[in-house]
Amino acid sequence: MLELSVNLDERSYPIYIGQSTLQDNGRLVHHIGDCRPIIITNDTIAPLYLQGLLAQLATLNPLHFIIPDGEQYKSLTWFEKISAFLLENNCGRDTCLIALGGGVVGDLTGFVAACYQRGIPFIQMPTTLLSQVDSSVGGKTAVNHPLGKNMIGAFYQPQAVFIDTQSLHTLPAREFAAGMAEVIKYGLIYDTELFAYLEQNVERLQQLDEACLQHIIYRCCEIKALIVAQDEKEQGLRALLNLGHTFAHAIEAQMGYGVWLHGEAVATGMVLAAKLAYTRQDLTAEDVTRISGLIAQYSLPTQIPAVMTSEHFLQHMRKDKKNKKGTIRFILPTQFGQCALVDDVSDDQVRALIEQ
């Protein structure tokens, strides 16, 4: 088993990566402490892992709550339903929520934990590649609003993150590909060696080679932990983790949450960001081809939805959380392994990019 830490002084916490970490009863019970565990999962993951986890925690009198599977359920409606469940079961501050599932379960559970009785502990047990390499680490919790993704949320760190690579063997191929978009992102913003590794190991990763999986998950979590330790509340450096997301959130909001997977939207968003960087002479045409080529190799989309216009993009981008004083700000690659936050992209440049 691999282990690393997110260093945030008294709120630091470990990340455990390996096979069968979902069965690591000793560590899990240690992090639950004297609390009563409440497992939050969805109706896809529950048949696979819920009973095993309940059996492990039987002496702690656990409860569970199951939500439907899908991005559209990361909402205030389901936030309220989980909160009502906790209240109906007289759950106090000595309650520990366990998020067993992908990014939707993790974000929703974390937001409930942040708000319920002004904050209770929670543990992340991510079961998708995207949540393992990105959303489970760093304390971003949120629900979506019809007018924008992740618009209602809080920064709230978990007690621990348990990443079980075996869960990826039950993940649909489309979901695995979506997770690879976030892995590629880390290579683009921070680590040229990781990007090259992804180019060299496409087949091994798609075959779920254990050594390859542990390598990329560990490296992504390591990068995320380093960035979060320096900029927990996304005032500067952490914003670079949003490469491709300005475009991606516009796609998700316009198309309807769940129509495009988050990773699919991020993949296309990174291609658009690379093309925009090319127009600014920060990347070469060969760089753009290399980026879009790797994204395509992992069976991810590189073209925007045919029904979306430049005005659709601009409408949603004007609500982006990175904006300042009404100016849309983008994360753009300046070279492989480096990105920058820019605020001098005009609406006409966006229109030209989308309409080309």
From Swiss-Prot:
One of its GO terms (cellular component) is cytoplasm. It is found in: Cytoplasm. It is an enzyme of class 4 (lyase). Zn(2+) binds at E182, H245, H262. GO terms for molecular function: 3-dehydroquinate synthase activity; metal ion binding; nucleotide binding. Catalyzes the conversion of 3-deoxy-D-arabino-heptulosonate 7-phosphate (DAHP) to dehydroquinate (DHQ). This is 3-dehydroquinate synthase. It comes from Pseudoalteromonas translucida (strain TAC 125). The gene is aroB.
